[in-house]
Amino acid sequence: MPIPIKEGPSVKAATRIVQTAVLALMLFAAAIRPGHATPATDVEKYLAGLATWSADFTQTIDDGHGKVLRSAAGRFYLERPGKFRWDYVEPSEQLVLADGKQIWFYDKDLEQANVRDMDSTLASTPASLLSGGGSVSTQFDIKALPPAGGLQWFQLIPKRADTDFQLVRIGFDKGELASMFLADKLGEVTQLTFTHSSRNAKFPADLFSFTPPPGVDVIGRNPK
């Protein structure tokens, strides 16, 4: 984004991006088969067939009035159940990685890493659906929106009041995830654009593991 990791709220913001992107992947089926059953039904059917997903991404965060606050780019990887990785390459090298138990936030330039328990960080969030933590329809109100900009759009509003975001809008291009907008309760809007995606490809065994390099300051509970 870039993802500053010195303070808790910044880590929380990075986690929120991960949570909503995971949910976006689960809406492929609704975009592939518009008008078939309901969006929630299609999402749950699709989960059985989703093993891995990856894509290049660009990300911007604005103040809700069009003023860009931060921008970044990199590649995103997902492997069910419960693993994901954000490799930020612009404007600096940073990493957000979940190995199924912990989530790591690593900033190469700052030589700093923050590690958190995955269950407590992602509980009752979109990402909890990765490990079967509830159905889409019980956690979100989902509706199809009119096509716009050549994309098929869906809107998700959380049913719980204690979430960090107000709504998510997700756009698909011929069944492939292409764009996502997230409005949080602070008024900021995050936009993610995905390109060069790959579904159910085999990843290297060590893609979702992280060991802090020598000299890196580790904040939080180190699983080692």
Segments predicted by a language model, with ranges:
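N-terminal leader/targeting segments and the immediate start of mature chains
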Residues: 2, 28, 33-69, 212-224
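Amphipathic hydrophobic-ligand
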Residues: 68-75, 187
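Gly/Pro-enriched, hydrophobic low-complexity segments
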Residues: 114, 138-141, 145-224
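Short, solvent-exposed helix-to-loop capping segments enriched in aromatics
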Residues: 47, 122-137
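Bacterial N-terminal signal peptides that target proteins for export
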Residues: 5-22
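Extended beta-sheet lipid-handling architectures
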Residues: 55-57, 71-73, 86, 165, ...
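An acidic-aromatic
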Residues: 75-124, 190-191
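A generic structural motif
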Residues: 58-62, 87-89, 106-108, 157-159, ...
